[in-house]
């Protein structure tokens, strides 16, 4: 078997954790499906077909504009990539071309390049998103059931294709409530999963980082994305946005431990032969695991037992114990009728 990409991730000498599902999704496909190290053949579109209307956002790796295709007058989103290693750009392009057309994955229309700077831009479908800070507080239980099912469908699809998103958070989940349409966007941190590879833990956004990233467990897998889903769900249900609000990466794990317990954290580390990194020496205290009822108040009308049980099965230290996307969709919360 050819070695998976090696510059960003390393094949490990000691395999201590392998995904419970879809572990060989990449191995079962030809090497050109996942190997972005050799470069990617790009079918460049014409940049003159698109015009920028206005800027709608910027991230670490890109600037995002609303735009229009002048050929068919269709609105679109134009993501102009900032100059980074070509390997990272190749990875995003390969992942997007593999996934586009999949359920609830943002549609990639075209890839164009500025003639002078050679900087690539990605042309995506436009979603009339309502900001989560406005939208989520309006959700009733049937809305949570519907939209989280849509999100889990997207995740189960990308996982089945051997791809971890690695940056699931409200800002990357576009929802158009009029059309009841959800799209998972921003695949810039996504990566192909290969068993026994040590992955970079500097991924995901702080409030949605799984404990595995915070304790330098490099052999993580798709289950990382399910922790992030659990964080989103807990924030909505317990009316606490974000649910775990650390002031730094080490403090993020402390915030998690105040809820899930320190003894349980040490048990997790022990199982995988890891030690708490030294940056926790002065900040990690002996926290007792809290019951989820601790977060239920007269305000948390959505915190029915079924959804709390789902949260409990997603927010687990041990990534192997978390529900997979498919298992989560089969959870009783999604089968219960709410008014």
From Swiss-Prot:
Q: Domain Protein kinase: where? A: 50-334
Q: Which reaction does it catalyse?
A: L-seryl-[protein] + ATP = O-phospho-L-seryl-[protein] + ADP + H(+); L-threonyl-[protein] + ATP = O-phospho-L-threonyl-[protein] + ADP + H(+)
Write down a Pfam family by its short name: Pkinase
A molecular-function term among this protein's GO annotations: ATP binding
Task: Supply one GO CC term from the record.
Answer: small-subunit processome
Which Gene3D superfamilies has this protein been placed in? Answer: Phosphorylase Kinase, domain 1, Transferase(Phosphotransferase) domain 1
**Has the keyword Nucleotide-binding been applied to this entry?**
yes
- On the tree of life, the source organism's domain of life is Eukaryota
Q: Where is the active site?
A: 167
Enzyme class (EC, first level): transferase
InterPro entries registered for this protein in UniProt: CK2_alpha, Kinase-like_dom_sf, Prot_kinase_dom, Protein_kinase_ATP_BS, Ser/Thr_kinase_AS
Per UniProt, ATP binds at 56-64, 79
Under which EC number(s) is this enzyme classified?
A: 2.7.11.1
List UniProt keywords, sorted A-Z.
Answer: ATP-binding, Kinase, Nucleotide-binding, Serine/threonine-protein kinase, Transferase
Q: What else is known?
A: Present with 4540 molecules/cell in log phase SD medium.
Q: How does it assemble?
A: Tetramer composed of an alpha chain, an alpha', one beta chain and one beta' chain. Interacts with FACT subunits POB3 and SPT16. Interacts with NAP1. Interacts with YTA7.
The family line of this record is: Belongs to the protein kinase superfamily. Ser/Thr protein kinase family. CK2 subfamily.
Its function, per the record, reads:
Catalytic subunit of a constitutively active serine/threonine-protein kinase complex that phosphorylates a large number of substrates containing acidic residues C-terminal to the phosphorylated serine or threonine. Phosphorylates YTA7 during S-phase to promote transcription of histones.
Name this protein carries in UniProt: Casein kinase II subunit alpha'
Q: Which organism is it from?
A: Saccharomyces cerevisiae (strain ATCC 204508 / S288c) (Baker's yeast)
